[in-house]
Every structure is written in structure tokens, then in C-alpha cells.
Amino acid sequence: MTDVTIKALASEIQTSVDRLIQQFADAGIRKSADDSVTAQEKQTLLTHLNREHGSAPDKLTLQRKTRSTLNIPGTGGKSKSVQIEVRKKRTFVKRDPQEAERLAAEEQAQREAEEQARREAEEAAKREAQLKAEREAAEQAKREVADKAKREAAEKDKVSNQHTDEMTKTAQAEKIRRENEAAELKRKSEEEARRKLEEEARRVAEEARRMAEENEKNWSETSDSPEDSSDYHVTTSQHARQAEDDNDREVEGGRGRSRSSKAARPAKKGNKHAESKADREEARAAVRGGKGGKHRKGSALQQGFQKPAQAVNRDVIIGETITVGELANKMAVKGSQVIKAMMKLGAMATINQVIDQETAQLVAEEMGHKVILRRENELEEAVMSDRDTGAAAEPRAPVVTIMGHVDHGKTSLLDYIRSTKVASGEAGGITQHIGAYHVETDNGMITFLDTPGHAAFTSMRARGAQATDIVVLVVAADDGVMPQTIEAIQHAKAAQVPVVVAVNKIDKPEADPDRVKNELSQYGILPEEWGGESQFVHVSAKAGTGIDDLLDAILLQAEVLELKAVRNGMASGAVIESFLDKGRGPVATVLVREGTLHKGDIVLCGFEYGRVRAMRDELGREVLEAGPSIPVEILGLSGVPAAGDEVTVVRDEKKAREVALYRQGKFREVKLARQQKSKLENMFANMTEGEVHEVNIVLKADVQGSVEAISDSLLKLSTDEVKVKIIGSGVGGITETDATLAAASNAILVGFNVRADASARKVIEAESLDLRYYSVIYNLIDEVKAAMSGMLSPELKQQIIGLAEVRDVFKSPKFGAIAGCMVTEGTIKRHNPIRVLRDNVVIYEGELESLRRFKDDVNEVRNGMECGIGVKNYNDVRVGDMIEVFEIIEIQRSID
């Protein structure tokens, strides 16, 4: 249908253009005279008009008038003509479709009710006829008894009245005749019923024989074994017995007759499923039983299940975690029953929620089942126990961790000890991840771990303290105890590791070693000369003074500790650091604790496993083995392990893979169990939270420790208004997948000591993504803070700009009360918000409506000048009031 204009449509339907435009406007469609109208808009208008004026009338009234003339004879023989008008009125009602359906349903229900009533009436008539026949039979029996008594009386008194005797004999003969007729009718009906039953029995037997012949034919086609005859006889005898039972039930009558007739209904030709399942099973059982001997009997295979009289108590095996649905399946009950039992115990759970072993045990025992607790790490324990750990323990080198505040000279001190220049290679001179080195000294070998001092690397310092024997706490003599120094002391105490204090930068003029001792004593680190257990050594990493004394102190402390380890046997250790190398794959820095790690060993490392393909020391040289307290880089793992994971050499790579996969699944279950679910108790808290802005970040770094540290630091920046969300993180360069993820989630791409490859740069350029590279963690955190600060809503502050004192009050016909004021402070500006103060109490807050000076409207009045002030919608201004003018300024907030 083509579109027409408003004018053409108006002429077509014979109405005015203005009326048609108004009708379209009422229907919600704005049109002008030259606009075109689509078919959809026409339909909308038609629907609106039908709704306004109503569609076709529901009632139709027809009126008919019939006029005729009637001649009425009048007086004097004259006829009088009378006009007669007959008016007929008939109303037709158009029913609503729902009403029509309802009436049709009512008519159908009425017809069904009438049919039901008719059937009930017929049944009542049948019952009445049967009762009437029974009553007649009873009366007949009574009459027979009475007649017998009369006959006996008549025989005793034969001579009394011959005529009476003859009448009695005639009545008796009539009664005998009626009795004979009733007996004949009863005999005929019984013969008819017996004949029908016999025909039915013959038909059932014939059907049974026919089915037996078909079964014999089927069995003969599939097998030529002598069991066919057995099948034939068993099937035939079975159906014969069935026919006999049916016949007996029909003869007995009652409900059994109707049921047996239904059961004996003939099966369709060719329907192999017409036989009952019990018959076929018994026939097959008899055939199988015929192999053993001739006299083996076939027993009917019937369902032997009976509903248990009491609850079945089961042995429920429960692992460390289990979902509510799995627990319900193990107890063979519905999940709702388990949830109900948990609610009785005071715990709310959904059917897919993971519950711990103790809760599952309580629920199962509450429901009456026996619980068997299963340790799911049996395979892991078996793999760990099947290790050759050696026997003889030998002295080993101490593992020393250098800890302290940032920029206190930890790396410089270690540089001097190693006689290499490493700090210049660190970005900004700050250690970004753990470095592990072993140093040969004149008095023996020492392994050093250099940890970062920045606040973000708390977890890395904690790992360093756990993997170490001695902590060297570096404190700058000119700076004293700082926050990370205190944190290092706490880590050392938590790991129960002895502390050797190196007071660094002793060569500076402002150095104050005694101040360091006093401050450290407040945290439980007392020098030996004060009766404590900690050695204090004054060193200068720049000048090299005191370095030998520090090494001697470390070796002395190690000698006191009597450090020993098994050198021969399968190695075990810890991951100090890990990262993903583009050419070599996952690389892990491992500190061997016991045994000897060889090239080619199969290692299990947290969620990862693999064969050691290559080993390198801290200088990048290839080595074939590493003993206790030796840090090495290993290649060949299946993935990047988490820093701090245990490294264990095992015998079987297949079992190592199984254990690693089990650990991954276990970690996932624990993570799901810890997830915060949106339950009823925190629903209102979620509802009350306002709009929260999010800063999405995709983070890539060079090593795993840096990823963890940066993620923790960024997540700690989150506030109630702005939250940091790490969409994705990983080790290695920025790939195309990372760029696509950032584009899909509107995230910032952050690279820490890594770069984007060519394909990623194309996606970043095409999507105009925000890509930022960092090499110092300070800069990264500061820029994310700045981005978050931009998302914070500004803070509104009221700043008073002027104060005026009311000296007099005038009346104005236009503005009402006008306050004649003297500006005492600042500037009074027009259209600014004001407050009216009376006795230093705010009584009104509004805005200036009029500001005049000598009858001239002005925009502002300065200090020391008089003016007239009209306050909008306020006339209760009195002499002595103060009018305070202020302005609202926005202050940009920042993340602290």
C-alpha cells in the first residue's frame, strides 16, 4: 500500500484537513497537511478512533411499523373506518467473543449435565426394576408359605367345605405354574451366560495357540537349537493357564469379570509386544534353564521390589568440599530436604552451593546416615612419599635475605659483596623483584636473596622471609627506622628467623647509629652489647667499610644455627620468582633446600609440572645440577608457577600431571566456596550502594611477583565511589588477545617492563586504546590515582564573599520590603545565594532579587558602600539583621 498525503486522505474520507490532523495528534502522531501517511500510521489512527468512539455496535435494534384499516360497524347502519398501526421492535445483541465462548461452554456443560442426568435416570430405573423384581420374589415366597399352611389346614379339614377345597387346589396349581415359568426363565439366562463364557474361553485359547505358533516360528528362524520345543510348550502352557484363569475369574463374576475381559482382549496381528513381559521373561528363563536338565522348572519373573518399611541408612562418602545437590544424590533424597535440614541447623544454602566437609557431615548425620570422610589428597601424599630423600645430612650454606626500607642501600650492599653493578640496571635504582645470588667468600658460601623495599611488595618480602635462614636488616644511619623496616621486622619475627642489623651509610656526616639502635629497640631488636640477641654491624656499601665484618657476623650466626641438609637424593625447594620468556617459555627461579636438582628431573611445582630441560645459575651459565642453598633458573614447566610454590622432584611424570590437575580443580572449588554470594543478608547493602565508577585495567608485567604486587597495590586504591578492576593480568609481553580484551571491556592497557608486539599495536591503534608503559611502580600507581581522581565527583564548598548590615527597611510596591544596607565586608554580588542572620542565627536562605545603589540597578557593591537589597520571596527583614552573600565553588577531589 502506497503512502498518501494528509490532504489526499482527507478528501478520500470526506473530512477536513484540520480535523484529520487533530485526530492524528490525538493518536500521538504529529503531522502537517503536506506530510505523507503510512499504512502503519493509518492503522494506528483507526485503532485510536475505534477505541474513542467504539467499534461496530454491540446492539442492533430493528423497528417495523404495519398500518391497516379496520371497518367497525357504527350506529345507524354506518361503518366506521379506523386506522391501526402495529409497531414491532426487535433487538439483536452482538456477543463478545469471550462471552460467546462462555455461553458455548455453559451450553456444553448443560448438555453434558442433561446426558449425565439421563444416564443416572436409566440406571435408577434399572435399579428400581431390579428391586421390584426382588420384592415380587419375596412376596411370592411369602405367598407360597401361606399357601402351604392353607393346604395343610385344608387337608385336616377336608370335610368342612368341598367348594373351598377346590378353590384352594386351583390357586395352588396357578402358583406352581408361575414358579415353573420363573425357573425356566432363570435356567435360560444361565445357559446363555455360560455359552458366552465358553465362547470367550475358546477364543482366548485359540489366540494363545496362535501366539504360541508365531513364537515357535520366530524361535525356529533365529535358532535351530532343541530349546524351540521347550519355548513352544512353555509359551502354550503359559497362555493356556492364563486363559483358564481368565475363565475362572469371569465365572466368578463381579469386578474380576470386567478386568479379565479387558485382559483377554485379542492382540493385533503382527504385534509382538502384545504378550505380557512376564510371559516372555518366563519363557526365556525356561529355555535357558532347559540346558541343565529336563526337570528344571521355569519360575515366573516378577518384580520383587517392595517399598521399604523404614528409612534406609546409607554410608555417605564426603570429600573436603561438596555441593548440596551432590550430597542429596549420595543420600538418595531430594535437594529440598537437604536444604530444609540445613535451615533447621541454622545455615542457608542453595542447591549448587559448595559446603565444607564439616557442614556436610553434620547434615548427613542429622538425617540419620553414616558418614565416611575421604581425604582427597591421597594421590598427592602417595606421590610425595615415593621419593628417595637420602639419609646423611651435611652442613649447608646459609640463605640470607636482605630486607629493609626502600633506598636504604640493600642492592648496593649486595653489589659490593658480589663486586658487580646491578642497581644501575634496576629502573630508578629500585629493586622490582627478588634477586637470588650465591657468593663464595673466604669463609664459605652464602646465598643472598634481595627483596624489594617498596610498600607494594609485601607478599614478596614475606616469601623471602619464609625461604631464608638469616635476615640482614639494612637500616640507613641517616634515615632511621621507616615503615618497611618495621614490616621487615614483623616478617622476620613471624618466620622466627634471627636478624643481623646492617647500619648502612655510616660514612655520611649526618649518620647517627645510636639513634638506629634506640629506634630498633622499641620493636624488640636489641644489640648484643645491650643484652640482646641481634648483631649490629656498621657498614658503608659505597665505601666498602665493614663488609667483611658483616659476612663474618652472618657466618657466625649460621654456625650457631647448625644448618644441615641432605645433599644426595631427590630435591625439594621453593619458587623465588617466575616469568614467561618469549623464546624459552615459563622460567622459574628455584632455591633448592634439600637434595640435588639434576637436569632431566621431573618436578611438581604448585599447579604446574614438567621435566627440567635446562638449568642456569644467576650469571646465566648452564649447570647440570644444583645442591642445597643454590638458586637456579629452570626451564620446561607446563606453565608459570606462582612465586612461593613448593618445588618437588617426583618419579612419575603421569602422576605429577594428575596431582597438578587435582590441585587446579581443588583451587577452583575453594575459590567458588569463598565467593561472596548475593544473599538476603547483603541484599540491602547492595541496594543502598550508589553509582560506582570503575577503572578497568589489563596488566602485563615481566615477572609473576610484579604482577601480584601491582595488582594488590591497585586494588587497595579502590574507594566507595571509584573501584579498580583488574580485567586481566599475566606474565609476558602485551599480545593481540590482551588488546582485544581491553577493547571489549573499555580498559587501560598497562605494561610493566614489557612491550606490545606488532599485532597488538595494530589493534591498539585501530581501537584507539590507552596503552601505558612503566618501569617504576611509583609512576604507575600515581597515574592510576590521577585517573581515579578524575572520576570522583567534585566537592562543593560555600565561600562567603560579602557581608552587609541592615540599617533601615523600606517598602517597595514591586519588591516588597527593601533592606537599606551598609556593606561591612567583601563584595555584595547580584544573583548570588544569600543568608539572612538575626542574632548570628540563620533565619532564611535564598537569593538576591534586587541590588540597587541610588536607584540604579548594579551588579555588585563593594565594602564600605550603601545599597538597597531586595530578598526574593522574603519580606521579614528587620533593622540589625546581617545579610551574608556566598558562592558555591567546586573543589576537585583526589585519591589519598
Curated annotation (Swiss-Prot):
Pfam families xref list: EF-G_D2, GTP_EFTU, GTP_EFTU_D2, IF-2, IF2_assoc, IF2_N
Keywords: Cytoplasm, GTP-binding, Initiation factor, Nucleotide-binding, Protein biosynthesis
Residues reported to bind GTP: 404-411, 450-454, 504-507
Region described as Disordered: spans on this chain: 93-307
Region (G2): 429-433
Composition bias type Basic residues, residue spans: 256-271
Cellular component, GO annotation: cytosol
Places the protein is found: Cytoplasm
PROSITE patterns linked: G_TR_2, IF2
Region (G3): 450-453
Role, per record: One of the essential components for the initiation of protein synthesis. Protects formylmethionyl-tRNA from spontaneous hydrolysis and promotes its binding to the 30S ribosomal subunits. Also involved in the hydrolysis of GTP during the formation of the 70S ribosomal complex.
Protein name: Translation initiation factor IF-2
Biological source species: Klebsiella pneumoniae (strain 342)
Phylogenetic classification of the source organism: Bacteria, Pseudomonadati, Pseudomonadota, Gammaproteobacteria, Enterobacterales
